[in-house]
Amino acid sequence: MLDLKRIRNNSNEIKEALNNRGEKFDVTVIDEVLKLDEERRNILVKVEVLKSKRNQVSSEVPKLKKEGKDVSNIVAEMKNLSEEIKGFDATLAKIDEKIQYIMLRIPNIPNPQVPDGETDEDNIEIRNWLEPTKFDFEPKAHWDIGTNLNILDFERAGKVTGSRFTFYKGLGARLERAVISYFLDTHTEKHGYTEILPPYMVNRTSMIGTGQLPKFEEDAFKISEDDYFLIPTAEVPVTNLYRDEILKGDELPLKHVAYSACFRSEAGSAGRDTRGLVRQHQFNKVELVKFTKPEQSYEELEKLTNDAETVLKELGIPYRVVRICKGDLGFTAALKYDLEVWMPSYNRYVEISSCSNFEDFQARRANIRYKEDAKAKPQYVHTLNGSGVAIGRTVAAILENYQSEDGSVTIPEVLRPYMGGREVIK
């Protein structure tokens, strides 16, 4: 959520920034929120005048009573003033509700570093690692490799549940578990993150806090009876861990890593990478989340991105890092990098992680603040997160980049200790 004071003082700048985003945003709502804000402030002035008058009148009552004078007129005036204040308070509550409704639907403002552009084709490659994998045979797609090795079963998952679900079997299940354990061990032991195992269901307030709601409710799996949501990413519960709290400045940055299953309806994604493991309704992911002081956040974003890159380097999977343009930035991020792995069957790079700085956008929605010391005024933290990284897509990238002509798959060296020393799946 944006700072209303920032909108008030820089409305034209805000409108221009919002106009440059991918989804054309109706900037007239900025004028609407400013009009409501002005109305609210005018009413507050009136309320303060009325309260001052009521206090002045009420202070006269004891003295007049002591003198034996009739105070019925003054009491009646006090009652009228209180009723008038009550009416204004009700109006203010309605105005606040309208302002909140609009503010929750205004996207974040892109950082000046974000490049211009309208689609993902305008994203800028920052760096890459390893050349795309070459084969002297026609490489197979990971869904064919997994099916032929009897380690992935899409057909039976379709029977049991529906499309875009998977059974991992035998060494496929073990490979998935190995990747999860390797990622968690790397981020906790080498990168200094504290591990969190979060709930897989959250309430509506949590989804609003991280920006999934109200805009993306159609993409969420909802348990209507309790108004709970299955998490689309561990970012939601881990960020909301500190909702409505004031952190200590010397604790920052806080660094958490969380493994979780993730659940997404992927509404509107029909036909986009829907085969295999790339776009599933349920998938596993290791998430990195940071809470920082504002002046630290962009340095910490670079570190977070490098932490995510480390596991791809150690796995030996070719990848690149792209800086996301304004048109492809999404609702909540101020600046975002995507890590994309090379997928031979696609003959292109596929996103495996998004690393974002939200600045104070989520912190304002979730009311997460910090104080430098006991006497200092609370300030909003900056929140960051990134996949560290998506598990299913990692398994897919391993199957495709490490495949052999005979259909077997070499296990990356760093995963072999988690696979009982096994070197090949065949």
From Swiss-Prot:
Q: Which residues form the signal peptide?
A: none
From the UniProt record, list the reaction(s) this protein catalyses. Answer: tRNA(Ser) + L-serine + ATP = L-seryl-tRNA(Ser) + AMP + diphosphate + H(+); tRNA(Sec) + L-serine + ATP = L-seryl-tRNA(Sec) + AMP + diphosphate + H(+)
* Keywords, sorted A to Z: Aminoacyl-tRNA synthetase, ATP-binding, Cytoplasm, Ligase, Nucleotide-binding, Protein biosynthesis
In the UniProt record, does the keyword Cytoplasm occur?
Answer: yes
Report the pathway entry.
Aminoacyl-tRNA biosynthesis; selenocysteinyl-tRNA(Sec) biosynthesis; L-seryl-tRNA(Sec) from L-serine and tRNA(Sec): step 1/1
**Which positions bind ATP?**
R264, S265, E266, E351, I352, S353, S354
**UniProt binding sites for L-serine:** T233, A234, E235, E287, S387
Cellular localization per UniProt? Cytoplasm
Name the source's superkingdom. Bacteria
Classification via InterPro entries: aa-tRNA-synt_IIb, aa-tRNA-synth_II, aa-tRNA-synth_II/BPL/LPL, Ser-tRNA-ligase_type_1, Ser-tRNA-synth_1_N, SerRS_1_N_sf, SerRS_core, tRNA-bd_arm
One GO CC term, this protein:
cytoplasm
Fill in the subunit field for this protein: Homodimer. The tRNA molecule binds across the dimer.
Similarity comment: Belongs to the class-II aminoacyl-tRNA synthetase family. Type-1 seryl-tRNA synthetase subfamily.
Q: What is known of its domains?
A: Consists of two distinct domains, a catalytic core and a N-terminal extension that is involved in tRNA binding.
Q: What does this protein do?
A: Catalyzes the attachment of serine to tRNA(Ser). Is also able to aminoacylate tRNA(Sec) with serine, to form the misacylated tRNA L-seryl-tRNA(Sec), which will be further converted into selenocysteinyl-tRNA(Sec).
Q: What is this protein called?
A: Serine--tRNA ligase
Task: Point out the gene that encodes the protein.
Answer: serS
